[in-house]
Structure formats: C-alpha cells, structure tokens
C-alpha cells in the first residue's frame, strides 16, 4: 500500500512529510546514514576508475546528494559519482588530462538541463518491460561482480566476516525492524575487527579520505570553449548515460513505492546537480541504483530528507569521523552489496515458469539487454541494445499482420482489401500478395482497413498499380481516410476515389 508520505511529490511537501511522525523521521535518518556508508567504498572505487583522487568523488557525491534532494523529481533516490559516468569520462582523463574533466562535467550538466526542459523524459514510455527487467537483472549482476575484487586473494577472515554480516542482515529483521540490518551488520563487524585485531582490508585501503570540506572553484569556461571539440563527445555521452540510468532508476523506485515521479524534473535536476559538482571540481554522476535500493527497499526511506542526509552524513563521516570510517572492513560493505544484488534481481522474471509463458521474443530482448550490459559494463549500452532489439521484434510482428483478400470480383471490376499497418517492413510482402493475372478491367485497392504510414508503403502501392497498368488494367485506390489519404495525395500519383 502506498505510504502516506509519498503523496507529496513537491520539494517542500516531501521534506515536511519526513517530520510527519517520529517513526518516519527515524526511518529517514537511518536510511541516510546506511546509504552514506554504502556510498563511500563505491564512490572511491569509481573515482579510481575515472582516474581522479578519491576525494574528488566523495565531494562530488556530497554535492550531488544535497543538490538532487532539492531539485530532483524522485524523492529518496540517491545520486552520486556513479560508475556508468566514470566509464564515459575515464578515457577523457586518461588521453587528455584532468584539466579537461571539470569543463566536460559542466557541459554535461548543461546538456542534461536542456534535454530535461526539452521533454526527453517522455521517451521513457518507449522502454518496454522486457528491457526494464533486463536492466534490473543486469544491474544486480554488475553489483555482484563489482564486489568480487574484494573477496578474491584476501585473508580467510574476510569470508568469515562476510558470512557474519550476511547472517546478521538475514536474522536481524526478525528481531528488530526499527534499526536497518545493514547498519547493524556494519557496526558489529567493524567492532569485531577492531576489538579482535583482525587484519582485513578496510575502507581506508581503498583510498585517502578527505580532511576538510570542499572548496568552491570557478570552472575554466574559456578553456572549455577552446577545447570544445575534445570535451563535447564525452560530455554528451556522460549526459545521455546519466539520464538513462537516472530515469530508469526513478521508474524502478516508482514501481517499488507505487508512486509516480516527475521524470522531467529529475532530468533537469540531475543537470543542475552536475553543474553544481563542477564548481567543487567534481567528476560528475547520476543515480546510484544500488545505494538507492538500500535507501528505499532496505531502509524504507521515502522522502527527500534521506537523500539530503545521505550527502550530509557522507561529508561528516569522511571528514570528522574519517579515522573510524576508514576502519570499517570491506567485508561488511561487500556483504551489504551482496544482499542488495540479491534483492535487486527480479527473480520472477527469470523463473522457468515465467519464461515458459513469456513470448520468446521478449525473453530474447531481456537476455540481450543483460548480456550487452554485463559485457560492456555499461547500463546505457544495454538499454539501447534492448530497445533496438525490442523495436526490431515489434516491427517484425506487425509486418506479418498485413493481409490482402480479394473481396469482390466481376469481369469489369475486382476489389482487393488490404488490412493492417503498411510501412517499410510490411510493404514488400504486400506487393507479392496480389493476383496480377486477374482478368478484370478495373482493379480497386481498398485500404479502408489499413493505415498507410510512410513513403515505403506509398511506393509499394504505386508498384502494385504499375504492375497492373503494364497488363492494361485501370487501378484506383479506395477507402483511404485521414492521415493515410493525406500521405497518398501528397506522395503519389495514384488514382484515389473517395467512397
């Protein structure tokens, strides 16, 4: 059932609803705290992937969490320095240098603002369910695979701590539902490691934590214009990848919370957050679906306050409590992400009984989305491949739904009725569905039950008429209405008869 606090999508309403009760307020606080802890190792890892100092990623995440809490269209969604954007920007840093990064992030944010105001979010309706399932399942696989580096070639005690963490997260909800299991697991395992002097990899081993708050900088706009040709492709790629991942994450959270979010606002809000991150020398980012799942699904957070607190707690933890945070064993955080991966996977979509009922084409599209995403390690590429595959499958199905039937025949006139959608994919089959040895003097092509969509369909009808004219027949098109009639008159020289 929909949570009462999710009925206010506006910013003020969402923040106010966080204070509607002590239980809700407590949930938002715990959600922000657990999410901030889960952000630290992921952000540090993605910073290393992008080729920047881990402090850059942590400051970026603080600014973007705080920014999106006010500008975003999906309350409780977590936005930070994400891996998908890091993968796009990494070649820019590697091939051209760090000085190109901030102008590229600034440009990417401006592109996202423009696309958001231009209504790009409306394109979400063209992403089918099979692609969404593939996206979610691929994400679960990527989250799982990203943790393997932390459990390979490590001391054997790491596996013990992972097992303890997993056990706590499984058992704890049966004992207490107030405090999130992931937070309990992190605290308990950290205490065991410190008190037991257990030598295992920690958060500190992933990179240096900052010792102060981020300082404002003025992006070198002149430098950006001078090297626009270099940064533009990377900025455009990061903008599109970030938007796709954020909008898909927002849709996923909509399904979990049973609430519709403002995708247009999320689009330009993400752009504003990226622009803001550029003013602290940030690396750019987008929605972090793993951390969002921790916040929304595990912590049950529902308002903007949890997102705001995730950013605030992140900064406080790494600056004020950096020494303590640095001692958190990676085993605890890996276990948290394992649970996130397990719960993120749409098990119903891969159930053999479901797969047997689903059309083979939809299963193939879901599989293609998963494979493309995992192989490229890029969710946006997987979604694009899935949408293209789904489009091809749909076009193929619709193309075979066109029929031609001879409905009237006399020595003088023979009428053929065309039913279905006439467009580039179906037009070729239509041409070969007529009887060109028909002895009638006049051939009528009845399109009253058909829709003429493009020039390929018009060209096919002209080809049919030409074949009959070569045999001395008179050809006329009847039954055309609306847009089909307009296209036939504008694009062809066919004889069109109104009935």
PLM features per residue range, with description:
Residues 344-493:
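The feature marks cytosolic C-terminal regulatory regions of anion transporters and related permeases
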Residues 42, 59-68, 82-93, 310:
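Hydrophobic alpha-helical segments within and immediately flanking transmembrane helices
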Residues 17-26, 30-33, 38-75, 225-305:
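Membrane-embedded helical hairpins/re-entrant loop segments and their flanking transmembrane helices
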Residues 33, 63, 82, 106-110, ...:
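Hydrophobic residues within alpha-helical transmembrane segments
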Residues 1-33, 38, 89-90, 94-257, ...:
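Core transmembrane helix bundle of multi-pass membrane transport proteins
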Residues 1-26, 200-217, 399-417, 472-499:
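Intrinsically disordered, low-complexity non-transmembrane regions of multi-pass membrane transporters
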Residues 50-59, 73-86, 121-135, 178-184, ...:
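Short, non-helical or kinked segments that cap or interrupt transmembrane helices
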């Amino acid at each position: 059932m929909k949570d009462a606090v999710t009925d206010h999508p506006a910013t003020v309403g969402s923040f106010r609803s966080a204070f509607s009760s002590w239980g809700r307020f407590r949930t938002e606080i715990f959600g922000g705290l657990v999410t901030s802890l889960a952000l630290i190792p992921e952000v540090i890892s993605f910073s290393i992937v992008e080729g920047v100092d881990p402090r850059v990623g942590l400051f970026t995440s603080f600014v973007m969490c705080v920014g999106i809490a006010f500008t975003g269209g999906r309350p409780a969604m977590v936005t930070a320095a994400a891996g998908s954007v890091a993968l796009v920007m990494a070649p820019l840093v590697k091939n051209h240098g760090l000085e190109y990064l901030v102008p590229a992030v600034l440009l990417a944010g401006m592109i996202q603002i423009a696309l958001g105001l231009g209504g790009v979010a409306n394109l979400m309706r063209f992403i089918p369910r099979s692609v969404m399932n593939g996206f979610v399942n691929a994400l679960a696989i990527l989250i799982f695979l990203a943790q393997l580096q932390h459990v390979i070639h490590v001391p054997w005690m790491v596996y013990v701590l992972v097992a303890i963490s997993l056990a706590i997260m499984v058992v704890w909800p049966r004992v207490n539902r107030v405090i999130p299991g992931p937070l309990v697991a992190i605290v308990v395992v950290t205490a065991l490691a410190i008190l037991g002097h257990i030598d295992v990899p920690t958060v500190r081993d992933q990179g240096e934590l900052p010792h102060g708050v981020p300082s404002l900088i003025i992006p070198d706009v002149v430098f950006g214009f001078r090297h626009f040709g270099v940064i533009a492709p990377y900025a455009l790629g990061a903008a599109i990848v970030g938007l796709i991942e954020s909008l898909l994450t927002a849709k996923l959270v909509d399904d979990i919370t049973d609430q519709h979010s403002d995708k247009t606002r999320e689009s330009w809000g993400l752009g504003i957050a990226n622009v803001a991150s550029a003013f602290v020398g940030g690396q750019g980012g987008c929605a972090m679906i793993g951390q969002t799942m921790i916040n929304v699904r595990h912590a049950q957070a529902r308002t903007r306050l949890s997102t705001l607190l995730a950013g605030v707690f992140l900064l406080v933890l790494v600056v004020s409590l950096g020494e303590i945070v640095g001692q958190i064993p990676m085993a605890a955080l890996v276990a948290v992400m394992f649970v996130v991966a397990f719960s993120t996977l749409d098990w119903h979509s891969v159930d053999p009984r479901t797969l047997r009922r689903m059309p083979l084409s939809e299963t193939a599209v879901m599989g293609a989305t998963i494979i493309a995403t995992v192989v490229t390690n890029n969710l946006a590429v997987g979604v694009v491949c899935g949408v293209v595959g789904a489009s091809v499958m749909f076009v193929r199905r619709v193309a075979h739904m066109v029929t031609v039937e001879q409905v009237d025949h006399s020595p003088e006139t023979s009428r053929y009725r065309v039913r279905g959608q006439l467009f580039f994919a179906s037009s070729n089959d239509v041409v070969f569905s007529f009887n060109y040895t028909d002895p009638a003097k006049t051939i009528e092509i009845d399109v009253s039950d058909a829709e003429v969509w493009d020039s390929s369909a018009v060209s096919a009808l002209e080809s049919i008429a030409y074949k009959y004219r070569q045999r001395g027949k008179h050809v006329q098109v009847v039954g055309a209405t609306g847009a089909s009639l307009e296209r036939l008159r504008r694009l062809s020289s066919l004889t069109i008869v109104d009935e």
